[in-house]
Design a protein with these regions (language model features):
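Short, low-complexity N-terminal intrinsically disordered segments enriched in polar/charged residues
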Residues: 1-27, 31
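Charged, low-complexity, helix/coiled-coil-prone segments
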Residues: 1-7, 40-47, 100-103
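Short, flexible micro-motifs
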Residues: 19, 23, 55, 110
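A beta-strand edge to alpha-helix "cap/lid" segment located at domain peripheries
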Residues: 2, 58-120
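A solvent-exposed, acidic/Ser-Thr-rich amphipathic alpha-helical stretch
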Residues: 24, 28-77
Length: 120
């Protein structure tokens, strides 16, 4: 992982995800950011859309508060775009894989689309 190709802080992303630190993650988003989540509860025809750092922060608080492990498997940054894969595991063994695409402005996330797939 190379953290010198962009002003986007990939190490903060890793720390926030792997340490379940919602405050660190929240700081990576622009005040007017938008997050779109597609998963088993929010299909492509009706995705969950969160607007603004406050709404995104509430989502991150809830996610980081869950008893589970998070691993940032890979992150790629190219100019004003980034992508990452995240693997999660609940204590009962249930796994979740998240793939995310990010649009960046001034080193902050302005738009994120995340697709999450859960074990059946």
């Amino acid at each position: 992982m190379n953290t010198t190709t962009s002003t986007f802080d990939t190490e903060a992303l890793r720390r926030g995800i792997e340490e379940r630190d919602a405050a660190t993650l929240r700081a990576l988003y622009a005040p007017d950011a938008e997050m779109t989540v597609v998963d088993r509860n929010a299909p492509p025809s009706q995705p969950r859309v969160l607007r603004g750092r406050t709404a995104i922060g509430e989502f991150l608080d809830e996610t980081c508060g869950r008893d589970m492990t998070h691993l940032l498997e890979r992150v790629v940054v190219s100019g004003d775009t980034a992508a990452f894969t995240q693997a999660c595991r609940y204590p009962d063994g249930t796994r979740v894989l998240c793939l995310a695409m990010l649009d960046l402005r001034d080193g902050l996330i302005v738009s994120q689309t995340a697709v999450q797939e859960w074990d059946a």
